[in-house]
Amino acid sequence: MTPTHFSLNAAFMLGLAGLTFHRVHLLSALLCLEGMMLSLFISMALWTLKTESMSLSTAPMLLLAFSACEASAGLALLVATARTHGSDHMKNLNLLQC
């Protein structure tokens, strides 16, 4: 395993571990998701450069566009939750309590 692969895998695993263990605030969960998506974007971009495939060159940009959509939807949810409930705790997002 090359150092580049190791660092990208470690970044993804740290984001996943942060998402599973530190799920108290919505903002921290969104930051962990963004870290995971960024490591996936970099690994896909490096993979398309390594294989020199023109048919796969749009996949990293598509992933980045979906990541931006996910971030904007997450921030909108964060603002709506903070306005209605007064905090960004993940326990407020339980729909069974409504």
From Swiss-Prot:
The keyword Mitochondrion applies. One of its GO terms (biological process) is ATP synthesis coupled electron transport. GO terms for molecular function: NADH dehydrogenase (ubiquinone) activity. The keyword Transmembrane helix applies. InterPro entries: NADH_UbQ_OxRdtase_chain4L/K, NUOK/Mnh_C1-like. It is a multi-pass membrane protein. Its EC number is 7.1.1.2. It is found in: Mitochondrion inner membrane. The chain crosses the membrane at residues 1-21, 26-46, 59-79. It is an enzyme of class 7 (translocase). Keywords: Electron transport, Membrane, Mitochondrion, Mitochondrion inner membrane, NAD, Respiratory chain, Translocase, Transmembrane, Transmembrane helix, Transport, Ubiquinone. PANTHER family: NADH-UBIQUINONE OXIDOREDUCTASE CHAIN 4L, NADH-UBIQUINONE OXIDOREDUCTASE SUBUNIT ND4L. Core subunit of respiratory chain NADH dehydrogenase (Complex I) which is composed of 45 different subunits. Core subunit of the mitochondrial membrane respiratory chain NADH dehydrogenase (Complex I) which catalyzes electron transfer from NADH through the respiratory chain, using ubiquinone as an electron acceptor. Part of the enzyme membrane arm which is embedded in the lipid bilayer and involved in proton translocation. This is NADH-ubiquinone oxidoreductase chain 4L. The lineage of its organism: Eukaryota, Metazoa, Chordata, Craniata, Vertebrata.
